[in-house]
Design a protein with these regions (language model features):
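Non-catalytic DNA-recognition/assembly elements of restriction-modification systems
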Residues: 9, 13, 18, 77-108
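Short, charged beta-turn/beta-strand-edge "cap" motif at the junction between a beta-strand
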Residues: 167-171
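Extended, domain-scale alpha-helical bundle/helix-rich regions
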Residues: 6-81
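Basic, amphipathic alpha-helical recognition segments used for DNA target recognition
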Residues: 95-102, 131-138, 152, 158, ...
Length: 214
């Protein structure tokens, strides 16, 4: 087994809960999901986000099969989607239940002709290399405050995760508290989790998804 294979195996063991002993006294994942759903409901009520029409809940039925219940009441058996048995206290959910995902703007919405010199009034444009090299200080592209006001859908803040979506796909970077507010460019996706307690787990599982899809 080479280094890459070992790394992939460790990642898979971690995702399946086989890397370290599981503590039965740990708070079950269902409690955390309830907190996330409550936070999402609050944001919807305050008009900060829109209700997800594809929202669903995954649960295990009395027959031990897994089902997904959608917002319209439809229930579907998803046993064929379950890749492995979960440890006690773990539960399945869709990634979109954990946060808000936003791809960068189309090419014509953000071009080099719109960039301005760096100043105390300019706004940072986050690039793919920020995600790949895990450093918010990299990059030399900025936009004016007027342009920034037109691109509010692509704004990123500290505690967001940026994901590279072109070339080197799937590199993730959690923006620290001292990272400046900016916007993402075309090669990035912004992820804003409802609960920051799951940042490490989200990044781990996202890496696992990319691994199994290769």
């Amino acid at each position: 087994m080479n280094g890459k294979q070992l790394k992939n195996s460790i990642l898979q063991w971690a995702i399946q809960g086989k890397l370290v002993p599981q503590d039965p006294n740990d708070e079950p994942a269902s409690v955390l999901l309830d907190k996330i759903r409550a936070e999402k409901a609050r944001l919807i009520k305050e008009g900060k986000i829109k209700k997800d029409k594809k929202e669903s809940i995954i649960y295990r039925g009395e027959d031990n099969s897994y089902y997904e219940k959608f917002a319209d009441g439809k229930v579907v058996c998803i046993d064929d989607e379950i890749p492995y048995k979960l440890p006690f206290g773990w539960t399945w959910c869709r990634l979109n239940e954990l946060g808000i995902y936003r791809k960068g703007p189309f090419g014509s919405s953000l071009t080099k002709s719109m960039f301005v010199p760096k100043s105390k009034h300019s706004i940072k444009v986050y690039e793919q290399k920020n995600a790949i090299q895990k450093d918010y200080r990299l990059g030399e592209y900025y936009i004016s405050k007027d342009k920034f006001s037109e691109m509010q859908s692509f704004v990123t803040h500290p505690s967001d995760i940026i994901v590279s979506c072109a070339g080197t796909i799937g590199e993730t970077y959690f923006l620290p508290q001292d990272a400046p507010i900016g916007i993402i460019n075309q090669a990035l996706m912004r992820v804003r989790l409802y609960n920051l307690d799951i940042v490490d787990y989200w990044q781990l599982f996202f890496a696992y998804i990319l691994l199994i899809e290769k």
